[in-house]
Amino acid sequence: MFLKTVMERNQPLVRLGIEWQQNGVILPDTYLLDYDTILENARSIKQAGDANGVQNFFMLKQIGRNPLIARALTDMGYVGAVCVDFREALTMVENQIPLGNVGHLVQIPRAALKKILRAKPVIVTVYTLEKAREISAACTELGLHQKLMLRVLGEGDMLYSGQYGGFELQELDSAVRAIEAMPNVEVGGVCSFPCFLYDEAAQDILPMPNLRTVQTAAEMLRASPLARSSLALTTFRKTSGRTCASTR
């Protein structure tokens, strides 16, 4: 889907790929990554985030969860990796890459839970109280404390097929009450996906109803007497499109 943009902006990479494939240097179905350009784009994004008080995480599922690039990004000052599925999280753990957020699209399976929690992710997304209880039990056994981010749902939210799940706004209060009673975990934020999508007609990235759901949930939690006084609430407003106009 990005081939046209690559051909327009990075012709040397395209020419090199053709040359290497035709000369037998690489096989078909080989991924070529322009390391220098990736890092240049990453610096631009981080500078924009820093200037606006936004913590920067990175996601590498689109480029094969590459640990070499992940290490360069953490050295650059990125907080850690966003691992939307457990295989990506395990790859990062095995390469000593800090974990930012885990479980956003695919919940962490029980069999991988302890290994991932030992890596001390900044925050773990949960869709259900059952998963929160599993994390609580594992953290209690391991002697860890984990922040949880609740995926929230509102009426009219845009959801992709196969990605349903989360806490409806009307049950958020009771869910927070239940989680705050669990040992070794706490509510640390709310999220949804996608909160922004590219609109072909408008030729721009526009907010989805999910964004208002996240804002409402955050307001509810901040106003709730159930939330711990030390809670520094994090809202993740996930986009499904590129949002930094200055990248190459």
Where are the model-predicted features located?
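Active-site-proximal loop/turn and secondary-structure-junction residues that shape catalytic pockets
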Residues: 62-64, 85-88, 106-108, 128-131, ...
